[in-house]
Amino acid sequence: MIPVIAALNQHFYLEKVCKHLRHLFPKVVSYNRLVELEREVAIPLTLFIKKVLLGKCTGIRFVDSTPLRVCRNQRIHIHKVFKGIAQRGKCSMGWFFGFKLHLICNEKGEILNFMITPGDVDDRKPLEYKTFVEFMCGKLVGDKGYISKNLFQRLFVDGIQLITKLKSNMKGALMSV
C-alpha cells in the first residue's frame, strides 16, 4: 500500500521507497510499472481504506475536495492509464486532468469518508449521495463551493447542518450555531 500512495510523488518513490525502504519492499517495481499497476490496485485499496482506516464521527466535520492530477494538460491526448475514466476539471489552481478526491474529516483530522470522482464533477455532488454522508449527523463545515439551498435542505432533513461562508453578493441568512 505504501508504494501505491508514494507513487503520487515520483521523486519520493524513487529516492525513498526504492533506495531507503528497499528492505521493506524487496520486490519493488520500477516507477513506470507502478503507474501501470495503479489502475488495478485502485479499487482494492479503496475498499481496504474504507473498511479499516476510517476515523470515528465525533461532532464537527469538515468537507473539501482536492484535484488528483494524472498527467499534465499538454499530455492529455497521449495519456493511456486512466483513458476514458479521468476527466478535465477546474479547481482554484486552474485546469487539470484527472480525478477529484472528496474528503470528510473530523476535528482531529481523521478521515471519516472519502470519494474519488472524475475531475469534472461538481464539489457538491458527492454530498447528495446517501452513502457518502451516512452515519453522520451534526455540523458539516465547507467552503463557498458547497453553497446550495437544495443541498442545505436535503442534508438538514438527514440531521446534518451544512455551514458555509456567505458569498459577497448574498444576503445574510439566519443560522443556529
Question: Where do the language-model regions lie?
Answer:
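Short alpha-helical elements
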Residues: 1-177
